[in-house]
Curated annotation (Swiss-Prot):
GO terms for cellular component: ribonucleoprotein complex; ribosome. Binds the 23S rRNA. Part of the 50S ribosomal subunit. Belongs to the bacterial ribosomal protein bL31 family. Type A subfamily. This is Large ribosomal subunit protein bL31. PROSITE patterns: RIBOSOMAL_L31.
Length: 78
């Protein structure tokens, strides 16, 4: 391998809530602080519900504006 062209491969910390995971990476900072817990994502955890941050003004505005919009899905029984 040619020397001097590859980034340094070093210990990398992933911090989620009170948990810390250690792995290896070329990321320059050496750590990442996650504000959303990846373990609670609905793609692999159906009990977690919606993980969208409702405090985000853009998301809240979108939900208010389009709350009654139907995309032709199944109709709810009344």
């Amino acid at each position: 391998m040619k020397s001097g062209i590859h980034p340094e491969y070093k210990k990398f910390l992933i911090k989620v809530e009170s948990d810390v995971f250690e792995t290896m990476s070329t990321h320059p900072t050496g750590e990442i602080l996650m504000d959303v817990d990846f373990r609670k994502h609905p793609a692999w955890n159906k009990d977690s519900g919606n993980v969208v941050n409702q405090s985000n003004k853009s998301v809240s505005d979108f939900n208010k504006r389009f709350s009654g919009l139907s995309f032709g899905g199944k109709k709810e029984a009344s």
